[in-house]
A protein has these predicted regions:
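Inter-lobe coupling/hinge segments of SF2-like helicase ATPases
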Residues: 1-211
Length: 211
């Protein structure tokens, strides 16, 4: 994310807009908040587009983007819709690039090509398979791999616990929270599915909050 911010800043210094696309509204909104907090002190204007941005607010954002008043535009698939016009798109950043199809990534890039420019692209992923494939499929891209832990980062210990010991895991989570520490509980789905028998984040959050 820091690399993406620095790249966007460099584009802004050259009077070019940056589009940052994420696969989910949650991730895109996190990026919007972070980028706004980091860039607003240096007078770089951000904009936000997603399916939740509708009506007058959406029209206002579209006008800012078209006029070049928004320099860094963050959003989801909404970024490459037909009514989105960039003033001078020079950089496209795609987070979790394996979550987007080729035509979707191309549609966003074409927003800059239509202005007689070819935007630079920065694609990011933390998933091993797309990262490995990129070295053979994307022969025209430079690949950077971050293979070192940040200074001071403690090693992670991975332990497999059967579902029968779920209560003991919950107890360890409660103990950690009582000490003011943070716990990440990752689920396969966000909402319950009628076809997939997988743990849903919304249901799990409700269950844990009652303990």
């Amino acid at each position: 994310t820091v690399i993406a911010v620095l790249a966007a800043t460099h584009a802004c210094e050259n009077k070019l807009q940056t589009a940052i696309m994420a696969p989910t509204e949650l991730l895109a909104e996190q990026h919007y908040m972070n980028f706004t907090n980091w860039l607003s002190p240096i007078n770089i204007k951000t904009a936000w587009l997603s399916s939740r941005v509708t009506g007058k607010r959406r029209n206002a954002e579209l006008e800012r983007i078209k006029a070049g008043q928004a320099e860094v535009i963050i959003g989801t698939h909404a970024l490459f819709q037909n009514d989105v016009e960039f003033n001078n798109l020079g950089l496209v950043i795609i987070d979790e690039q394996h979550r987007f199809g080729v035509h979707q990534r191309l549609a966003l890039r074409e927003k800059g090509v239509s202005r007689n420019t070819s935007p630079h692209q920065l694609v990011m992923t933390a998933t091993p398979i797309p990262r490995t494939l990129s070295m053979s499929v994307y022969a025209d891209l430079d690949v950077s791999v971050i293979d070192e832990l940040p200074p001071g980062r403690k090693p992670v210990t991975t332990t497999i616990v059967p579902d029968e010991r779920r209560n003991s895991v919950i107890k360890r989570v409660a103990d950690a929270c009582s000490k003011g520490r943070q716990v990440y509980w990752v689920c396969t789905l966000i909402e319950e599915s009628e076809t997939l028998q997988c743990q849903a984040a919304e249901v799990t959050a409700q269950q844990l909050s009652k303990l």
